[in-house]
């Protein structure tokens, strides 16, 4: 019985509200086939069901359950962090090159890679057009491969990573002549300048020397007896021997030591003219350039200074000078200045002085001092007490 004030419902299915209407939602994704219609599953009624209703059909609504599962995967690609990860993966090669060249990925790697990529790209494209259909060969290698082989040949076979950089600075600097000029706003850093040579470092073998690649052997005093041959057929070892001769004739051992140790500037100031004359004579006699002559002269000085244990040859001029002025003493540097002086016992003159009257009186003033002095020479010591040594303890004056 309907309540008063309410109309009687019409016969037919009941009308549902807007919140009760079944809605069909469909999410379309790109590059995916359309989904098939939802399947229906039939379930038999439970035999224990007292109502024994007909078979019940269960329909899976796509707008209620399925979108809740698929929406996270569909919207996952549009998350910010996912997009950044994909962008980093796509730009991995460019960012890697930028990190190697600049130390950081700045402005999307455009300052560091714009100039070089454009030049390399045009060169590769031109080479591909010219050699289209031609089989590859070592003579017709692409520009990038040729540059890599040229750089590897200049560096040697032991270093096969020319593009290694430390904090943006290349470990092995590229040649300045072939490297393009960087842009004004580029983030690439200039390579560090070559360190200045050490002050006390030995001179290295000069590349311009015609005998720079030869090996220099040490020599003994027996090598000094080699016959002097012509300058055209003389070897590097024989030239070093002759320089050794000239050094020992021109300078003393002490002066060569000071030249090698660099302890005295006065020696260089006094001997500048002699050293320059010696260098000029070496260059003229042996047909060497000035740098090679200086290097050989320095090596000869150091070789003579470091071979103190062996006897050094003495020239006749040096012996006559030392014999004429025996009182002149060389300045003491504290490093074995008396070794190898060249004086022998045959050159020394031993003189024995004759006894004078003053020497005889002095010997008589010392009792028991002279050998063979008689014990009973002085009678004043008779009858005095003596100790175990026999020397008198008390002198009695009568």
From Swiss-Prot:
Location(s), subcellular: Cytoplasm; Cell junction
GO biological process: developmental growth; establishment of skin barrier; keratinocyte development; keratinocyte proliferation; limb epidermis development; morphogenesis of embryonic epithelium; negative regulation of keratinocyte proliferation; negative regulation of stem cell proliferation
Region span, Disordered: 1-60, 123-156, 307-340, 369-392
An example Gene Ontology CC term for this record: cell cortex
Biased composition (Polar residues): 377-389
InterPro entries (alphabetical): KDF1 (IPR028003)
Keyword field contains Metal-binding: no
Signal sequence annotation: none
Modification Phosphoserine occurs at: 218
Alphabetical UniProt keywords: Cell junction, Cytoplasm, Developmental protein, Differentiation, Disease variant, Ectodermal dysplasia, Phosphoprotein
Function statement: Plays a role in the regulation of the epidermis formation during early development. Required both as an inhibitor of basal cell proliferation and a promoter of differentiation of basal progenitor cell progeny.
PANTHER family linked: KERATINOCYTE DIFFERENTIATION FACTOR 1
Name the UniProt record assigns to this protein: Keratinocyte differentiation factor 1
């Amino acid at each position: 019985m309907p309540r008063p004030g309410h109309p009687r419902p019409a016969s037919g299915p009941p009308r549902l509200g807007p919140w009760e209407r079944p809605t069909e939602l469909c999410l379309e994704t790109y590059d995916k086939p359309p989904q098939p219609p939802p399947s229906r599953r039939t379930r038999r009624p439970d035999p224990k069901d007292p109502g024994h209703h007909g078979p019940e059909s269960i329909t899976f609504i796509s707008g209620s359950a399925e979108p809740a599962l698929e929406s996270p995967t569909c919207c996952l690609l549009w998350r910010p962090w996912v997009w950044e990860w994909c962008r980093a993966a796509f730009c991995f090669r460019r960012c890697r090159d930028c990190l190697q060249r600049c130390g950081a990925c700045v402005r999307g790697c455009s300052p560091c890679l714009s100039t070089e990529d454009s030049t390399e790209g045009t060169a590769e494209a031109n080479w591909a057009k010219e050699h289209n259909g031609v089989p590859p060969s070592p003579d017709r290698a692409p520009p990038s491969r040729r540059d890599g082989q040229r750089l590897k040949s200049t560096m040697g076979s032991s270093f096969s990573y020319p593009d290694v950089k430390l904090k943006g600075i290349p470990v092995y600097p590229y040649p300045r002549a072939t490297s393009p000029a960087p842009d004004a706003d580029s983030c690439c850093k200039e390579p560090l300048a070559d360190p200045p040579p050490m002050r006390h470092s030995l001179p290295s073998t000069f590349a311009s020397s015609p005998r720079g690649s030869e090996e220099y052997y040490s020599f003994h005093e027996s090598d000094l007896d080699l016959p002097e041959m012509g300058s055209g057929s003389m070897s590097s070892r024989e030239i070093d021997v002759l320089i050794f001769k000239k050094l020992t004739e021109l300078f003393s051992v002490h002066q060569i030591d000071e030249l090698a140790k660099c302890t005295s500037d006065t020696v260089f100031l006094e001997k500048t003219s002699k050293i320059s004359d010696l260098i000029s004579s070496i260059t003229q006699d042996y047909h060497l350039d000035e740098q090679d002559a200086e290097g050989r002269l320095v090596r000869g000085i150091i070789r003579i200074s470091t071979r103190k244990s062996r006897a050094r040859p003495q020239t006749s001029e040096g012996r006559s000078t030392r014999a004429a002025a025996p009182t002149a003493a060389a300045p003491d540097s504290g490093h074995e200045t008396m070794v190898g002086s060249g004086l022998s016992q045959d050159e020394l003159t031993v003189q024995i002085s004759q006894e004078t009257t003053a020497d005889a009186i002095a010997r008589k003033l010392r009792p028991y001092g002279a050998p063979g002095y008689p014990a009973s020479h002085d009678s004043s010591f008779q009858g005095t007490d003596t100790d175990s040594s026999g020397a008198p303890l008390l002198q009695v004056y009568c």
